[in-house]
Amino acid sequence: MPEGARGLSLPKPSLRLGCGHQGEVCDCAAVSDTPTAQAATTMASPRGSGSSTSLSTVGSEGDPSPACSASRPEPLPEPPIRLHLLPVGIQGSVKPSRLERVAREIVETERAYVRDLRSIVEDYLGPLMDGRALGLNMEQVGTLFANIEDIYEFSSELLEDLEGCSSAGGIAECFVQRSEDFDIYTLYCMNYPSSLALLRELSVSPPATLWLQERQAQLRHSLPLQSFLLKPVQRILKYHLLLQELGKHWAEGPDSGGREMVEEAIVSMTAVAWYINDMKRKQEHAARLQEVQRRLGGWTGPELSAFGELVLEGTFRGGGGGGPRLRGGERLLFLFSRMLLVAKRRGPEYTYKGHIFCCNLSVSETPRDPLGFKVSDLTIPKHRHLFQAKNQEEKRLWIHCLQRLFFENHPASIPAKAKQVLLENSLHCAPKSKHIPEPPTSPLDSPRPRDAPGFTPGRRNPAPSPRLSGSRRGRRQSEPAKEAYVIFPQNDKPQVKHAGSEGELHPSSELQPVSASGLPEDLEDAGPPTLDPSGTSITEEILELLNQRGLRDSGPATHDIPKFPRDSRVPVESEPLPFQSLPSRESSEEEEEEDLETDEREPSPLHVLEGLEGSSAAEIPCIPSLTDIPSEVPSLPEIPEAPCLPCLSDISGVFEVPCLSPTSTVPDIPSLATTPSFPCGSWLPGPLQEAAQPQATRRELLSGSNPGRLSESPSESREGQEDDTEGVSFSAVQREAGTSVQGFPEELEYRSCSEIRSAWQALEQGQLARPGFPEPLLILEDSDLRGGSTSGKTGMPHSERSASRVRELARLYSERIQQMQRAETRASTNAPRRRPRVLAQPQPSPCPPQEEAEPGALPAFGHVLVCELAFPLNCTQESVPLGPAVLVQAATPLCIQGDDLSGQNLNVSDLSKQGHLSSNSIPPPVPLPGQSNFQNIQVPSTSLLPKQEPPDVQVPTASTLPDTSQLQSQVPAATPSAGHRNCVEIQVQSTTSLPGQECQADTVALSKQEGHEDSQNPNKAPGAEQRDVSIDQGLAVVGGRPVSPLPVCTSSPDQQIPATTPLPLSTDFPDMEGPGALPLPTQEGRPDCSIPCNPLPSLSQDVQVPAVIPVSQLQGLTDTRATVPLSSHKQEDAPECLGPEPSLTDTPAPRLLSSLGQQNTTDGPVSAAAVPLTEQGCSQDLQGLITSPVQTTMELPKPRGLVSRVATSESLDLTPPHSPSLSTRQLLGPSAAALSRYLAASYISQSLARRQGPGGEGTVASQGHWSSSAPTSRAPSPPPQPQPPAPPARRLSYATTVSIQVGGGGRLRPAKAQVRLNHPALLAAPHPGAVGPSQGPGGS
């Protein structure tokens, strides 16, 4: 047994440690005869022995001797500190061990403390309550004393327990057992500032001052009431120090029984001290925040308190502008837990200069200035600020805090444990910069290092030491990672201890420095958080202890005491705001700086997209947190400067989904568990990361097995994904998506349309050099990979994930951090997401679409991973082919008539039924002769009718028919189950014949009609003539009635009638009038079908026959939009892509029809694009007609399998043309992520279509109401480089699938969606007539 323990157990010493004290009252008769003097001496000696320098405040008044205790007669009749631990007979002969002295001191100091509390309650509170003095009302009395009575009662009970302990271990146990009860101090500590303020007011009043002085004299107190009121604050912050002393002297070794209890007590009380200290700091910061709010001018946002607590504030040299030089003036930075506010001092006021939400924050160091760092907004590339700190400590502190808040505000895609590991990692790995040698310096001071010794206010320090800029760049950032908490610990604990023991909340020395550093203007700051210093020491001590014990993880406070804070999320609370204020120096340069800010801001390469608010991709590289985290990796530093990748950095995303925010709060969300993916290549979402990678890499990733995998079995991938999330190898995930797409489910956050578009645009602009677009562009929703989980299980939350899983992930992150080559940021969807503008009611059908892999790996020219976090929403799964926008709207997946690929659902075919025929799932496609291919359609390789494969074919996803049952249709509902269901589905882009066929639904009928096959053959028909009937609306309603434009296109595949033939058809359509009006012949309601497929020769003109037309019947034909754009020209490869627009087409459709009637319907690729068909003169008319809602139409030059997007549109409702929007909405449902995907897909497809068009003679002007998301101008992209005609074999396809499922507990699993575009055709030389029409607002 440790010597101390033995000594304490000795009966004579009456180790009831404090028995003696209370003993007087209790039982120590023997002690009573002992002279008080002896007691005093004994007490003094232990104290003098240095048992604890922090214990200097033992006396009730702080006097070394207990003499003043005389005033406390009743309860403590005898001198309060009378206790003798030495046998009376041998006083002085045996010296108490250090452990005994410490234990005794704990009890003695508690007795003195309780005595002081009683004096406050009985001698001050009592008289004031009686109204005998000062005339204070009850409210003022409550403010002055708070819950002092409760504290007195609690402390009296604690004292009794301590006095009843017979060993040091027993004392420790008392604290452990009552640790939770100490929270009563929280209220008192938070009220203390108010109490002090009231007391000061009273001191100004002569009567009050006189009464207080008289009272002090009567009580013979050496200290005023103010000092007594401070004692509870000091005491609560001293317990952990006393216990640390106890543990320090506890004998080490096998006999050290009870040590665990002591350590537990230390941890518990340290946590209490930290918590109270933190609460106190928060209160002070809240007061400061109010002050800032009052003085801040030019701020038009909500109350600053809405952005969380004020974590740090400081004064820096610098300002806006991304130029290489620091421009003049001084900037005040106020770091809130959710936002960084930049202001400028103007006299006593602050002028608002800008703000950046923490979720969009990017921090990077400036290589040329060792003290400089740049803060930028990922969503607004031009919004950058360059600052110069006063010293290294301040810089490190700020960078660390900024990084930490970035992670904390990140969309919860990173588990809390992983975030912690990342930050800790950076802290531990970060080598201290040369300046840092003063590591001990408390970060507090550093921020204020008001006077960092070498710092000259105006000095720029332009030449950064190479060392610093290089390695530090990445690491430095992490260094600060010590976290405020850690930093605090760095403050000298001795200082803290002394301060605490002496009763000064804030060691004056520390406070002074801080305040000094702060300018008077920051008077608010001047008051250092009284607790900060102590907090620091506490943290430091805890860390020390935990490190020694190896408890670091469990210990409440290790360096990371922050853990507590972390969990509590006390953002850097540990850092006292005090750092904040730095001397202000106004500079005449300020104005200059301001002027330059604008100029220097570099325009975002993506700024062109008016809709992209957040195309801040450029800034992505700078994401501080990411870069920092990897800071260990020297290369990271470079990252910040990496060119802006179009990556989805636009976190801002176009939509803000309130519901998403909750996700962010859930660090543990299992889905997040996938975090392992993070380690993969970067923290960034796959897409970002990928974007960052050289294109080649991207290609390899995608073109390699990944594409194959993706295309081959989405379902498998999904399953795999689930597994991965479950803990399956993350590496696999990484490999798969190149960015661990699979692993991302959690991580994958919902990507805003703007992000995706930004990425795409960057690709388009050639930012990522790429040979052309020979490879398909894959936009995979995280679960694309796992396409198999049609069941939707994929989306189920992995709530069951255990903590061990979290730890594993954290470990993986830590290991990967050093491997990261790039740090990219992923958009924080969390932050301000915009609400999807027009989300329609979500489709209830939960059926997950089944996606089919397209045959063969697609060349990867680009791959963007789009992921969606689990939303608190309930969404239904939906699949939507993003066809021309119009189609999309119709939501009918065109999927190429063929059966759904997998025959999954013919739903589409049912489309006509619209009713979410998903259930319908029409019989598997009956491939028409020509169509048989359709089934394969999905597979690019599929023969697909020549063109037949509907563009949608594309895809697997295509299958999704948005409207259709949303999903499911997945496919191509195409299977025209009925004989021509295909047609319907068809869409058949291939329907070159389309022109002729044009009538979507008709087509279907057509399909039956002999022509179906033919249409299938459209390519055969060379379609050249066909141009794209695209009549998106195929059914356009003429005169408001659905008319199925059958562009007859006489050209049947073979016929190839030029389609010029105007369809008289139009007229027939009118009959259709109702969307459903025309009975579809066989169509089965495949309004979508749009299949232009059948260019039955005869049909051609005749086709227009209502019969075909019955399309209208398609009932949704109207809606249909069915763009069916057939590009006659060789549609073969027409990249259908184009048309993803949502297609408000509906409306246009009608117009279209009419015009069609006038002209060939055929031509009118109704798609809003109204792309002039080369051959079909009518296209122009159509164009006019169409208002473009249709956009989808695209003329694909020779797109062989013209996209049949068209069909898609039809869909749902037979509702009148207006319905389109409906379908669109349905598709999206409440899922903002799905919406953004659709919009992005629409944009991309339009972009591809534009590429197609030679000059795109007719750029589609039309845009859907979604247009905002898509660039308004549709200028045809630069004419596609002349390319050899698209390989006839290639077809253009595009489809998306979104699956959102509700898992147990009502939690949604991440939505999974897949969008694939095969645009090789685009590369092909655009058909002269072809135009890339569609641009429509993004699809759905």
Swiss-Prot record:
Q: Which GO terms describe its biological process?
A: regulation of actin filament polymerization
List each copy of the DH domain by range: 98-279
Tissues expressing the protein: Expressed in thymus, skeletal muscle, lung, testis, uterus, pancreas and heart and also expressed during embryogenesis.
Q: Where do Basic and acidic residues bias regions lie?
A: 560-572
Please give the residue ranges the record annotates as the region Disordered: 34-76, 431-623, 684-743, 820-855, 907-979, 991-1028, 1047-1069, 1125-1146, 1250-1340
Q: What does this protein do?
A: May be a transforming oncogene with exchange activity for CDC42. May be a guanine-nucleotide exchange factor (GEF) for RAC1 and CDC42. Activated by the binding to subunits beta and gamma of the heterotrimeric guanine nucleotide-binding protein (G protein). Involved in the regulation of actin polymerization.
- Domain PH as annotated: residue spans: 309-407
Give all Phosphoserine modified positions: 446, 465, 1219, 1269
Comp. bias intervals (Pro residues): 1276-1288
The annotated regions of Acidic residues compositional bias extend over 588-600
Entry keyword set: Guanine-nucleotide releasing factor, Phosphoprotein, Tumor suppressor
Phosphoprotein among keywords: yes
Pfam families linked: RhoGEF, SOS1_NGEF_PH
Q: Where is the composition biased (Low complexity)?
A: 45-62, 1319-1333
Q: Where is the composition biased (Polar residues)?
A: 34-44, 703-714, 820-831, 907-921, 930-945, 956-972, 1049-1059
What species does this protein belong to?
Mus musculus (Mouse)
Q: What is this protein called?
A: Pleckstrin homology domain-containing family G member 2
Q: Which gene encodes it?
A: Plekhg2
Q: Which residues carry this modification: Phosphothreonine?
A: 441, 1215
What molecular functions are annotated in GO for this chain?
Answer: guanyl-nucleotide exchange factor activity
Keyword presence, DNA-binding:
no
